Amino acid sequence: QPSLPLLKRKQDYQLCMNYECHPTNGVYTKIAFFDRYGDVIEEKIEKMKIFDFTYPDGSYTYQVSLLSAGFESLDFYSFSIKELNRV
């Protein structure tokens, strides 16, 4: 199982999904943040392929999932997480 990159608490990031879906809005992206005991601290569900998020304080790990919103076909290629610079 591939591992996700380590993220810094309170840092802003951009998640970019690379997939083709039919119909176009047939899938959502979910990112869930967990504390050291495995309890959910926060969840974010997005329709967009590219979105920003902040890694919450107190997070120990996180999980990225795809949720069906009625898609008929899905070709998943990759996703990336990049750190955003603070102003």
Predicted regions and their residues:
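Extra-cytoplasmic beta-strand recognition segments
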Residues: Q1-N25
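Residue-level recognition of well-ordered beta-strand positions that form the cores
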Residues: C16-E20, A32, S65-L67, S80
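Beta-strand acidic-aromatic groove motif in beta-rich domains, primarily in extracellular
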Residues: P23-D35
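Solvent-exposed strand-loop boundary residues in beta-sheet-rich modules
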Residues: D35-Y37, N85
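Ser/Thr- and Asn-enriched, surface-exposed coil loops between beta-strands
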Residues: K47-K49, G58-Y60
